[in-house]
Regions:
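General nucleic-acid-binding
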Residues: 46
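Secretory targeting and sorting signals
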Residues: 1-30
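Short, surface-exposed binding/anchoring microloops in extracellular/periplasmic proteins
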Residues: 49
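Beta-propeller-forming repeat regions
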Residues: 33-43, 52, 59-66, 74-90, ...
Length: 632
């Protein structure tokens, strides 16, 4: 049975916290049951470095919850221990001994070694390469990690889109060692359409889309998660007439416009069950939207589907509903449905987030300027806010109880926003700080804010900074701002994604395929990592980034320039910071389950320069599963 993740105890701003003595919890959910998490292995990787071989592995959230800091590690090469004393300051090790070998690690608890880890994943070329099955003219748009076979190592599910009209979308699964597991052909119901605004009307089985002819579709309609608690992730996807699974079976429907939600076996690519989507908007055409996962009852993961249909002049009016589902291993059952009232002022963005904004142990669904409660009721609409392309929710201010959000506002097609951005209380929707337009703007482009980001990029100021893509540095809404201290720079770094890459706890920035570091003293950036031979995709994004192997820092998954393979990159920067794997943090892991326009990753505790200790997660494993951290 799945149990809810216990959120943090109330944080009261104090001098000790602001001095960074510890990372205080942000809210309280008294004695909430524990959420079930994936039974991950050590995620050990071996990467060539200038001195020899850099090793990195996971501290599991399950063992940190049980033992806290009383965990050390021994590192082995070909069965011989390399370290003189157990490793305690990080979960990394630099091996400078000559020759190649098979690396493993063992945890040490109370002086007793635990079982040996699986052998390290070899990044012999500085990355792990995953060859893609032949599909001429296709590119990878998104990737979803999931443990499809239950062995503790993530596999990768990818969506592949054609740049040629009348070609189906493809959904494929691969191991990190390069084995193709299966392919699902989404069929004629997913064919890429002509470009232009009309391309925002998705084909019934479309899974994402932003090709040269695909317009600006952002309908992912895929997610990957273990819903039934058997230790293996399922794949959830929109399907329609003609969708063909790995075993050759097809979806057949009375009309090509009919849409379904299919549950796919993550290991075999075969369909396990399917249900039709709600038909509320069927008269207006097919629905696009987003998929994600949320713990709506605080115990079980549920599938969240957001359905969006475009109507009216220039297809510029949206009708939106949420349908949630539960899967017990056999049946996909509707949970609740919520149709967003047209008069509510609720306005969708290009993605959703599933986050426990009120810290009661149950996840809410955030969609731009509004939040839907875990029971399918409207929680709030941010006063005065409209549509934007990016929003972020996390513990941005360690001195303030609860979670905060930052969102930007877009001006286009004659729609003029009231302000360019806003920083707000994620629980109530109250705007805490609101940006201002230039006084002398002349047209939409002068006040359109296409991107906004947040991260701890200035260690001199407690908490996170936030900034936008506003080009005019003299504009009142431009520059870098700190959540407590206001404007701290008139210039800005790149504005695509926040990433944890180097050895400190501050944020770096990911743009295209490179990582850059902001220097607050000079108000400039410098590239600290830039791989060769790979490219970014739509909106300068790679298919995925996140903590999928190694220690708590994040990896980058990029497609090769010839579109024949994916490459997974991990950092080799030394660190003195030891954190449990981010993949076993509730908000962080659920952030992987949503797509649309790819957004930055966050934890639901404060992770920044001031962090000294993070709260123990209240998590457990599925019943009957042997712990990865058990004794040998």
């Amino acid at each position: 049975m799945h149990r809810p993740y216990r959120r943090r105890t109330v944080a009261v701003a104090s001098a000790a916290l602001l001095a960074g003595l510890f990372s205080a919890p942000a809210g309280h959910a008294a004695e909430a049951p524990r959420r079930v998490v994936e039974n991950l292995d050590r995620g050990l990787v071996a990467v060539p470095s200038a001195e020899g071989t850099f090793l990195s592995w996971r501290l599991l959230g399950t063992e940190y919850a049980r033992h806290g800091d009383a965990i050390a590690f021994n590192v082995y090469k070909n069965g011989r221990r390399l370290n003189r004393t157990p490793v305690t300051k990080s979960t990394t090790y630099q091996d400078n001994t000559p020759g190649k070998g098979a690396y493993t690690v063992r945890a040490v608890v109370n002086g007793r070694e635990q079982k040996r880890s699986p052998a390290a994943l070899d990044f012999a070329e500085g990355y792990a390469e995953i060859p893609l099955a032949t599909a001429d003219g296709y590119t990878v748009q998104h990737a979803w990690p999931g443990d499809l076979d239950g062995d503790g190592r993530y596999e990768i599910v990818v969506s592949r889109l054609s740049g040629t009209r009348d070609k189906p979308d493809l959904l494929e699964a691969y191991t990190l060692t390069g084995e193709r597991l299966w392919r699902v052909d989404q069929g004629p119901g997913s064919y890429t359409q002509a470009g232009g605004n009309g391309a925002n009307d998705p084909a019934p089985a479309a899974i994402s889309g932003s090709t040269a002819i695909g317009g600006y579709r952002n309908d992912d309609n895929v997610t990957v998660f273990d819903l039934d608690g058997d230790g293996k992730a399922e794949v959830l996807v929109h399907t329609a007439d003609g969708t063909t699974f790995e075993d050759g079976s097809k979806v057949t429907a009375a009309s090509p416009a009919n849409q379904f939600v299919s549950v796919i076996d993550g290991l075999t690519g075969t369909e396990r069950t399917r249900q039709p989507v709600p038909d509320d908007f069927v008269a207006d055409g097919p629905s696009g939207g987003h998929f994600g996962i949320a713990y709506l009852d605080g115990e079980h993961p549920s599938l969240v589907t957001k359905l969006v249909t475009r109507v009216g002049a220039k297809r510029g009016t949206f009708r939106t509903l949420f349908q949630t589902w539960d899967f017990d291993g056999t049946d996909l059952t509707p949970r609740w449905k919520y149709v967003v009232p047209a008069a509510s002022g609720a306005t969708s963005f290009h993605q959703i987030r599933t986050v426990d904004v009120d810290l009661d142990g149950k996840d809410e669904i955030a969609d731009g300027n509004y939040v839907v409660n875990s029971d399918g009721t409207l929680r709030y609409v941010v006063d005065g806010a409209g549509h934007g392309d990016r929003f972020h929710i996390a513990d941005l201010d360690p001195g303030r109880p609860g979670l905060e959000g930052f969102a930007i506002q877009q001006a286009e097609l004659g729609v003029i926003p009231n302000f360019p951005w806003y920083y707000y209380d994620a629980d109530t929707g109250e705007r805490l700080v609101t940006g201002q337009h230039p006084a002398d703007w002349a047209n939409d482009t002068d006040i359109d804010v296409g991107r906004g980001s947040t991260g701890d990029i200035d260690p001199d100021h407690p908490g996170y900074e936030y900034w936008t893509s506003t080009a005019d540095v003299t504009a009142p809404g431009a520059g870098v701002r700190n959540v407590r201290d206001g404007k701290v720079s008139t210039t800005t770094p790149s504005v695509n994604f926040r990433i944890w890459w180097d050895g400190d706890k501050a944020s770096e920035n990911l743009d295209f395929t490179y990582v850059e570091k902001w220097d607050p003293a000079t108000e400039t950036t410098s590239k600290i990592f830039e791989p060769s031979g790979v490219v970014s995709g739509a909106r300068n994004a790679t298919p995925f980034y996140g903590d999928v192997v190694g220690d708590w820092r994040e990896e980058i998954l990029a497609e090769t320039a010839d579109h024949t393979a994916l490459r997974l990159y991990t950092t080799t920067e030394p660190t003195r910071t030891r954190l449990y794997t981010l993949a076993q943090n509730a908000e962080y892991r659920l952030g992987w389950t949503v797509r649309g326009y790819l957004q930055s990753t966050y934890t639901d505790y404060y992770l920044g320069t001031e962090t000294r200790r993070v709260p123990k997660p209240s998590i457990t494993l599925p019943e009957g599963v042997v712990r990865s951290d058990d004794h040998a």
